[in-house]
Amino acid sequence: MIKIKRWYLPQCTLGVLTVNDFRCFTLELPMLDNAPNISCIYAAGGFRGNKHFSPHNGDVVAINNVMDRTNIQIHSGNYISQIRGCILVGDSIKFLDSDNIPDVTNSKATLAKLLKELPDSFNIEIT
């Protein structure tokens, strides 16, 4: 099971993702009433996830059963500008660019490690 514990900032949503003994950080869009492409996932709760290949993002985690949303993924990327409603993962949170919004680092390597920890299908708990 993936567990994501989030905290909300005006310009983004940050979190800590754990599965087994693996831990990383998450970056999402801010909370904007669950509006597609501009908001993080509105509802905390339980979801189903599975490993998936996305033509746009490569190997990802697909998050299913998200109310009023489709095609939600955990994928690689470092900056808030690379998100359209999905979740980015990284091994640390830093300010990498000049927009004064936190970023995540080493995202591709972090996603690869996460995918190795997961079975093909699993539960996701977001709080």
Identify the residue ranges that each predicted region occupies.
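Cell wall/extracellular polymer interaction/catalysis modules
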Residues: 1-103, 108-122
